[in-house]
Amino acid sequence: MSDDVDSETRSRTPSISSRQFIIPEDELATLDSENSSLDSGGEEASSGGSDAYSAAGGSTPVFSRLGQHPSTFFTGSQVAPIFDTSLYLFESLTQSLDSVDFSEALSLQTKTSATINSKSRELQLLVGEVQTHLRRLQTAFEQGQHTAQRVRHNLRDITRGVESLKQTFARSYPIEYHQALERAYERRAE
């Protein structure tokens, strides 16, 4: 319901007037008369844009230069280009790739690359050394495990032997065994 009301109250005209962007007819007539005077010179129009611009009045505004050859876009004839993009790109690249700056950047990049390569080699050597050291430690650890298992097994056997000897002495020599135990407890108490 609200959409119906909004559509009835809204204006269907564009919000921006296109008349603001139209070139007035008196300026078009001025541009056409300048074009005809430049084209009537024959060789003057085809000799180059800078000669035509200087002959047309020295330092003309940029906007008047843009309208000098309006028909070249539509007809496809190349009398004098408005803006030579390839020349502009070439000149900007030439300025940006100044030989001194380029050689300095190239030497800096070479030095940086050499530093990175040397550090990479050092790192690879260190990794190799650490891996060999790790292998040695792993073998030493495995040998230590085997030794610890042997010692644990031997201690278990010795403990069983001592317990069996205690029981044998306690049965065979009870008086001496208890006297020896009392002495041992007295030593611990001191």
Curated annotation (Swiss-Prot):
Function per UniProt: Component of the biogenesis of lysosome-related organelles complex-1 (BLOC-1) involved in endosomal cargo sorting.
Keywords (A to Z) from UniProt: Endosome, Transport
Family statement drawn from the similarity comment of this UniProt entry: Belongs to the KXD1 family.
Main location: other
Protein's name in the database: Biogenesis of lysosome-related organelles complex 1 subunit KXD1
GO biological process: endosome organization; regulation of protein localization
Compositional bias per record (Low complexity), positions renumbered to this chain: 36-56
Subunit text: Component of the biogenesis of lysosome-related organelles complex-1 (BLOC-1).
Signal peptide limits: none
Protein location: Endosome
Region (Disordered): 1-56
A GO-annotated cellular component: endosome
Organism: Eremothecium gossypii (strain ATCC 10895 / CBS 109.51 / FGSC 9923 / NRRL Y-1056) (Yeast)
Top-level lineage group: Eukaryota
